[in-house]
Amino acid sequence: MYEEQIDKMINTINHHATRYNSKISSKVIEALRQTPRHLFVESNTPYADRPLPIDCGQTISQPFIVAYMTEMLDIDPSHRVLEIGTGSGYQAAILSHMTNDVYTIERIPELGKKTQQILNKRIKTRISDGYNGWLEEGPFDRIIVTATADSPPQALIDQLTDGGKMIIPVKNPNGNEDLVLITKKNDKWDSTRLMGVRFVPLVKGYKGVDYGKA
């Protein structure tokens, strides 16, 4: 039913990647093909290459951005990966095709509970404050943040392993948003700007009690 839409999505993703002198690997493309995006968003065109609205005023990211962020993390099957901002659950589902050790945090209980019903049970979920990461389960080899921060949260950097990477949208001095790749080495970190983006803001705190892991 969705085969043509999926093929078109993949072609568009590959086209966008060339504009950024990048290439989306076959393993990421396969993860996109195996993850039914239409289960994560209510839309007549769930595979269109654009962000779409979901519940609670949030969005599901543009497929190219999902693919690009996943690609830039260079995830190995042995890696422990933390996602900040579960949202629809689509990005976490993609990550679960790259490694069996995926953790994801959502601050909005309505979204967190809904995605817990959709996601594979081996994905560890939590309804809590993403700014604080998941200290009890850290450290993590990779962290992906799906909301824009004023600056990279120190708690997340602290929870990266030596040699670990984090991809995160960050506000720049002009008030715009940059997608940034952070690499940690010997308790120091540096960042590389990848592209301009637009995400919902990363909000401190959470709406309700801390539900812990599920």
Regions found by a protein language model. Name each.
Residues M1-L82, Y90-I94, M98, L111-L119, ...:
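Class I SAM-dependent transferase core
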Residues A214:
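Glycine-rich phosphate/pyrophosphate-binding loop
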